[in-house]
Amino acid sequence: MTAQTMQIGNRPCRIYGEAHAEYLLLQMTGEHELQSIDHEVAAIAQSSRNFLFAAVPVENWNDALSPWEAPAVWGKQGFGGNAADTLRFLTEQVIPTLKQQFDLSENVKIILGGYSLAGLFALWASTQINLFYGVAAASPSVWFPGW
């Protein structure tokens, strides 16, 4: 399955899959994860499900994915608490754009996934809105202060 890059907002999202998909898989990704995305999508493609996968890049991981501000836990960089802005970007730009460009049903099953802090973001986002059919949180950062 080949990828295409689609500019959504100011972010180059990597998109895999087909129009009219039954599932829309969204994954917040850092630069360090992009090398393994092709393998991840190939594994998902082994299923019989028709899906569209979007790797949505995150520039400042600690700020964009943290649900609230918190001091540094390791190192010197704290957490900015901008997860609400990231969730708004997904719901107001990414999802509507993908639905339109790939002719997805209004009832498409949306699954939000992520690893580490992106996994925590996925868990948190599922508590904020009733939009996601499922969440995949791989090794989520549940150590996050206040979680």
Regions picked out by a protein language model, each given a short descriptive name:
Residues G113-A118, A122:
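Gly/Ala-rich beta-loop-alpha elbow adjacent to hydrolase catalytic centers
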Residues S105-V108:
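Short helix-loop-beta connector
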Residues V58, A136-F144:
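Active-site nucleophile loop of the alpha/beta-hydrolase fold
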Residues I111-G114, A138:
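Short beta-strand immediately N-terminal to the catalytic nucleophile in serine-hydrolase-like folds
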Residues G9-P12, E22-D103:
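Serine-hydrolase catalytic machinery in alpha/beta-hydrolase-like enzymes
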Residues E33-L34, V142-G146:
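Acidic-and-aromatic substrate-binding clefts and catalytic sites of carbohydrate-active enzymes
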Residues W124-G134:
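Conserved hydrolase catalytic core segment
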Residues M1-E18:
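N-terminal cap/lid segment of alpha/beta-hydrolase-fold proteins
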